[in-house]
């Protein structure tokens, strides 16, 4: 296509990740400039409130958007090309493989839910960050033509003989990248899930003394909704 590529990836300052190392390796293979961003973890409590201000609601929103608070300030280009939400077409999560892969109807039900506006790996909340930095967030996997292609396939057709074989076989460039691991959850592989668990002892953030971060996320969404109705934190806690 004649486009100049500059590759970006991130890792936590406490947790080197496979995705980060592989992105750097592939950039070297194709002779692309590469910028690796180490996300500082010491600011997590403050960053939590930044995510609340972005109206993050679910645990997935908080965890998936968090690192990009630090990535976008480092991006110099106008257009940001991403494979955002690609994994939704493949149904590679544990939940999908247990409950949704066995019939086309179930598989499409899973994908319909995944790509619903309030889900989609937190796309709407990610885009708020890209808009804040005046970037054009380009997401080919969210186009209608790509959706139609994948929805025409069953779970077996998109995952056998190996994950993402349609895409990897369509471009000769993938032959140069070597072996790539199967799907890795962004939040788990990067260490973000474990990092967010460290907020549970924080009484200001975990103000209802929850044992799960997903419940803390819901509490803050509820608090945001309550504030919109001009109530106070004390009223919300009652």
Protein language model features and the residues they cover:
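Peripheral terminal appendages
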Residues: 174-238
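ATP-dependent adenylate-handling active sites, centered on carboxylate activation for C-N bond formation
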Residues: 1-174, 187, 191-199, 233-237
């Amino acid at each position: 296509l004649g486009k100049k590529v500059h590759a970006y990836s991130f890792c936590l300052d406490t947790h080197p990740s496979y995705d980060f190392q592989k992105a750097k390796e592939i950039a070297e293979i194709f002779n692309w400039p590469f910028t690796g961003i180490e996300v500082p973890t010491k600011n997590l409590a403050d960053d939590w409130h930044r995510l609340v201000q972005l109206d993050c609601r679910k645990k997935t929103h908080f965890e998936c958007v968090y690192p990009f608070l630090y990535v976008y300030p480092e991006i110099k280009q106008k257009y940001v090309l991403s494979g955002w939400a690609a994994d939704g077409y493949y149904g590679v999560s544990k939940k999908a493989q247990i409950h949704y892969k066995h019939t086309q109807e179930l598989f499409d039900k899973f994908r319909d839910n995944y790509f619903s506006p309030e889900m989609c790996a937190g796309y709407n909340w990610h885009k708020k960050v890209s808009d804040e930095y005046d970037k054009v967030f380009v997401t080919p996997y969210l186009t209608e033509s790509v959706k139609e292609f994948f929805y025409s396939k069953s779970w077996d057709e998109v995952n056998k003989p190996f994950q993402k074989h349609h895409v990897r076989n369509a471009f000769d460039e993938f032959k140069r990248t070597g072996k790539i691991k199967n799907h890795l959850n962004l939040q788990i592989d990067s260490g973000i899930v474990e990092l967010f668990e460290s907020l549970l002892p924080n009484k200001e953030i975990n103000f209802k003394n929850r044992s799960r971060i997903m419940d803390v996320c819901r509490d803050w969404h509820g608090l945001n909704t309550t504030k919109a109705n001009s109530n106070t934190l004390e009223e919300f806690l009652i």
